[in-house]
Amino acid sequence: MRQERVAFERSLAARLVASGRLDEAAAERALRLRAGSEERLEQILTKLGLVHEKDVAEAMSSELGVPMALPSDFPDEPVLESASPKFLRQAQVLPLRDLPDRLLLAVADPLNKYPVQSLALLAGKPVEIRIATPSDVELAHERLYGGEKGAFGRIVDEIEQADDMGPDDDIDRLRDLASEEPVIRLVNLLIARAVESRASDIHIEPFQDRLAVRYRIDGVLREGALPPARLRAAVVSRIKIMAKLNIAERRLPQDGRIRIAIRGRDYDLRVATVPTLHGEGVTMRILDRSSLVEDFGVLGFRPDTLKRYLDLLDQPQGILLVTGPTGSGKTTTLYTSLLRLNTPEKKIFTVEDPIEYQLDGVNQVQVKPQIKLTFAEILRTLLRHNPDIIMVGEMRDFETAQVAIQAALTGHLVLSTLHTNNAAGSINRLLDMKVDDYLVTSTVNGVMAQRLVRRLCEQCRKPRQALPELIERMGLRPLMNGRDTTLYDAVGCDACHSTGYRGQMAVIEVLALSDAIRRLVLNHAEVREIQRVAMEEGMRTMYQDGLLKALDGSTTVEEVLRVTRDV
């Protein structure tokens, strides 16, 4: 068995090198470490951050000719209940399906025959294996067999029972601790729980006597598991190793990225650290490339609003602005727009800080202020590369606005964002940047403003009839058009974690620059006057769009008021 494993691990390392997932020197280093260790090669590779778990699992699958476990293979209820959860957990296996003629089993170590033979004996039938990552197996155990403590508590116990962790300023000891299996599993589990909860961000915050973990779900922060305070340095160090950051540098903020697979699906995590009074804090933004779809309806566009927006998006040249505060979904709207525009006939560039999603067929450029590679500098360069469409992550200053306007005047379509309260306010923001009014009216085709409201959970939302005084006070009557006066309240159930909401959608207003609005801009009219004329020309405000969504039962009036109160 030992010789079989050694031969397999050498073949596995060679396959990873041949596929470009591992360089040859790193492979030799890992094999040398393996010779004097009880750990498997795949454990060493992932522990050192040399290869992602999913890459190792896929290489094992190819090497052995054994299929990978698909996300749909993992059960919702325990399979083969006569099997001991403790045995399954220690063996890193999980029964997937009990079929009439065989047992389907997920395994993290396909060369370990003992649990396969034991379960075949217990089930009284042959076992067919599927390869899965250790994290996916552990997450499934947590979900199916959590018990009183669950996987999180057991991992913490393992770490607590280990040797003394040493002081937080012992970098070599921290590096070793962060590379030990229990800490790796703990951090992977924190990330996996966030993904399972549909979180957009993970916040790890050190305080004097505790380490807080919070997840932002549907725009609202919620408490997660609480690791012991003494683990804060180990947890942060593990994240920094995964993000390829310098674990010895704790005085300065650092930025990095992690790629991780959860239940067979790839996620990118944008990692930012910050030094605080009680240690380093970490924020991780979870980016799911597969969540980007060319479906504006999913984002919250109503058909008539979508038509107004697409009329602007399909213009051959000019500037289209998407505006709203941080976290209002502007970037998602722009990426969805690029998916629609991305055809073989068009050359598209983006200028971003940072690049959030990688888009095939789109040339994406990262801003690097430390070497003076700014938005404006990149834009000037791109104009020499014959683009059709340019997306600028943010029009944050006069210089960037000036070059964007030059691009629009020379026949390019420019998409960008601004931070303003509403669509009409974006025009005045450009004027405040000292952009000439005639250039604004000559280049800006339109502005879309948006905010995010939480979607009502369809499993537990509760209908009620709106009182006449509420209809008048909220301005609902002009929007009803024969609708009944049913509104819905958030209640809370297991499906939505007792919040009453599940998911988010945008409330939107689209302002097209008509001749009348251009005249107002040239006369430096106030924002209220521009908004009034835009509404007369058919623009529906974010507040009105939100009320329609409340009447549809998609959200609540309270949510609409929460996000539109300042517009």
Model-derived features: where do they sit?
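Short, flexible helix-loop junctions that flank or precede catalytic/ligand sites
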Residues: D176-R193, S197-V567
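N-terminal, intrinsically disordered, highly charged
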Residues: M1-E280, R285-L292, F296-G297, P303-T305, ...
